[in-house]
Amino acid sequence: CGMYDDEMNIIATGSCFGNTLRCMAVSSAHQGEGLMNQIVTHLISVQFERGNTHLFLYTKCNSAKFFGDLGFYEIARIDGQIVFMENRKTGFSAYLERLKKESEQSEVMKRFTSDNTQILSETSSETQKDLRIAALVMNANPFTLGHQYLVEKTAAESDILHLFIVSEDQSLVPFSVRKQLVLEGTAHLDNIIYHESGPYIISNATFPSYFQKDADAVMESHANLDLTIFVRIAQALGINCRYVGEEPNSQVTGIYNEIMAKKLPENEISCTIVPRKEANGAVISASTVRTALKNDNIELLKTLVPETTLRYFQSEKAAPVIAKIKAAENVVHH
């Protein structure tokens, strides 16, 4: 949206993207006139009309107080760079409570506590120190043999694995399908607690770039903010190690992994970067799978995905997803 003066010069603007407010600015000649307040109020109204009632925004540190006065609450900040905020006072704390409840009520935890006669909670930190409680975050767009290998390795090396599936629908394969394929492809493992990432584990798709001077600075801010939030999640669940797949061909992921390898140990969380599984002389990637689907290369697909994923894509239910992949101009980075 935009606001204009009498000569139709734009003097204030703001935008909606998904469940976020962004790109908000007021002309320097019109500061102090309450225009930003009007812009934010209008954007919130638009979002509510769209059915988006849980809203988020990113802002510079020196603007956080202003948005706080408009009903937004700080989730996390990187000093001197960026603040992540939401319009629910207890939004993030309620999310952490939900994760803890999911963990406590899971069959994994029930079986584990029954076998060990000790309850895993924040109050039993000494118990947790003796356990390897791992975390994996994956988009699985879609679930491949590479994902399966990473999950199997992490589960084998851990007492309990918290597996977070990115729930934002910014991918060619919708979340409901991605989740289904992850669950089916890991059903043979008995120490996994599954979580939907919710809106707090931040994806590249929703992280804004307009605050930063270049792509590396964007990635550094994204990584630091995402990891700050992850540390709080880890503390709530007793997670003491995180696994991640190596991305030798991705500068973006390389920066993220580099920051993660430094930041997590500072918070008593180890970081294990796992070399990627290969097939046909190359690393297995979801983008290669999407390319195979786009080109109807079923023989290649069979070498890249587990039976559960293959069965889905050969079923009638997959037709709309495959059609979407075929219609996309770029299936490599999506």
Regions found by a protein language model. Name each.
Residues 4-6, 87-88:
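Active-site beta-strand termini and strand-to-loop segments that position acidic
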Residues 47-60:
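Conserved GNAT acetyl-CoA-binding A-motif
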Residues 30, 34-43, 146:
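Conserved acetyl-CoA pyrophosphate-binding loop and the N-cap/start of the following alpha-helix
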Residues 40, 61-63:
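Short glycine/proline-centered loop/turn elements that form peptide/ligand docking sites
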Residues 59, 70-72, 77-334:
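Nucleotidyltransferase catalytic core that binds NTPs
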Residues 2, 8-25:
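Conserved beta-strand in the GNAT
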Residues 1-4, 76:
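N-terminal charged segments
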